[in-house]
Amino acid sequence: VRDGYIVKPTNCVIHCIPFSPGCDKDCKEKGAASGYCQAFGKHGNGCWCIDLPDKVPIKDPNQDCTR
């Protein structure tokens, strides 16, 4: 398990609204312990998951977001 930004298949972070419950819900659906909206982070407002299973893709800093 690890922590990280959940991403779309294009390696773009899933954006969110700070303090909304959406990220916690999305992260838990993917098997994480919890999650929250990381506001004003390096990738904008993105969903950060805690204790996410290794099989779930997270933001790869070595790859660009391809929209």
Curated annotation (Swiss-Prot):
Primary location: secreted
Keywords: Disulfide bond, Ion channel impairing toxin, Neurotoxin, Secreted, Toxin, Voltage-gated sodium channel impairing toxin
Organism domain of life: Eukaryota
One Pfam family it belongs to: Toxin_3
Subcellular compartments: Secreted
Residue ranges of domain LCN-type CS-alpha/beta in the record: 2-66
Disulfide bonds: C12-C65, C16-C37, C23-C47, C27-C49
GO molecular function term, any single one: toxin activity
Keyword check for Disulfide bond: yes
GO CC terms of this entry: extracellular region
Annotated propeptide span(s): 67
Tissues expressed in: Expressed by the venom gland.
Keyword presence, Disulfide bond: yes
GO annotation terms (biological process): defense response
Domain remarks in the Swiss-Prot or TrEMBL record: Has the structural arrangement of an alpha-helix connected to antiparallel beta-sheets by disulfide bonds (CS-alpha/beta).
Similarity field: Belongs to the long (4 C-C) scorpion toxin superfamily. Sodium channel inhibitor family. Alpha subfamily.
Functional summary from the UniProt entry: Alpha toxins bind voltage-independently at site-3 of sodium channels (Nav) and inhibit the inactivation of the activated channels, thereby blocking neuronal transmission.
Name by which UniProt lists this protein: Putative sodium channel alpha-toxin Acra7
